[in-house]
């Protein structure tokens, strides 16, 4: 039994995640990387946005088949990183997330990428119809305006309809990198697994009834469920858009979660519920 392929594969992946996340050819420790450390490294010229993005993409390529965190990847991530490097050289950092690789849950719009909400009917690859937005969700646009690089869109149960497991009709089952026999939490389990497995520095999840808190608890992350109206819901596929749906950050440390919340919070004319938060920001 000890020599069975499944045991060896699982054991090797778990051991790999316990080791420092140094990647051959990039020399960047991804496991403990923070937004502050990234900005310090960029300022010191230790590496570039392209270097960092390549490192994360290499790690995803190496381990994603085991954990299944993603529904889709952003094919333009490296091009965006290159443009951010040019911008950095000419005018400095765009914001606190300049060149920071992040992920978003696949019920949030990203211009040009399919939004499935985990449902096979919103994917031509599964026999449905692709839903391709022309604009970013408000929270996603704010991440990008702050310099973040969206690496991909993460798995979720169909229509974010489960709070313990993350199993979609589009991408199947997402696993928990800490223990693949345990649930990753849901419905933002894909984002939690991506951050936990060091596929990204941080990510966005959504919550209606525990969907940020549950996977954050299951995977030892800092997840923030904001007050309704603090973060715009424009461009997010709703479960209950009346007063309980929220978008929030998921990260490995409090600082990164707080910085991200500061970036995505605030009013927008496309979501009038956000104007109630103006005096509380």
Task: Indicate residue ranges for each PLM-predicted region.
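Boundary at the C-terminal end of the N-terminal hydrophobic targeting segment
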Residues: 23-25
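Structural signature of FAD isoalloxazine-binding scaffolds in flavoprotein oxidoreductases
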Residues: 213-218
């Amino acid at each position: 039994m000890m020599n069975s392929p499944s045991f060896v594969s699982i054991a090797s992946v778990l051991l790999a995640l316990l080791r420092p996340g140094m990647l051959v050819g990039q020399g960047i420790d991804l496991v403990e990387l923070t937004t502050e450390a990234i900005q310090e490294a960029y300022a010191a010229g230790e590496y570039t946005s392209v270097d960092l993005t390549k490192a994360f993409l290499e790690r995803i390529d190496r381990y994603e088949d085991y954990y299944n965190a993603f529904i889709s990847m952003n094919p333009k991530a490296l091009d965006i990183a290159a443009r951010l490097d040019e911008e950095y050289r000419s005018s400095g950092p765009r914001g606190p997330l300049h060149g920071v690789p992040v992920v978003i849950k696949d019920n949030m719009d990203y211009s040009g990428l399919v939004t499935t909400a985990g449902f096979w009917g919103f994917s031509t690859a599964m026999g449905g119809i692709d839903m391709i937005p022309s604009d970013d969700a408000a929270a996603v646009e704010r991440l990008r305006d702050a310099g973040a690089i969206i690496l991909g869109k993460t798995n979720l149960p169909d229509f974010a309809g489960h709070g313990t497991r993350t199993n979609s009709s589009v991408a199947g089952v997402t696993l928990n990198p800490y223990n693949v026999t345990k649930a990753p939490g849901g419905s933002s389990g894909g984002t939690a697994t991506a951050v936990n497995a060091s596929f990204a520095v941080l990510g966005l999840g959504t919550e209606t009834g525990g969907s940020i808190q549950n996977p954050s608890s299951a995977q030892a992350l800092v997840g923030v469920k904001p007050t309704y109206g603090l973060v715009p819901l424009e461009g997010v596929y709703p479960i209950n858009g009346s007063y309980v749906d929220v978008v929030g950050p998921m990260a490995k440390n409090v600082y990164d979660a707080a910085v991200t919340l500061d970036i995505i919070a605030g009013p927008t004319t496309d979501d009038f519920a956000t104007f109630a938060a103006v005096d509380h920001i």
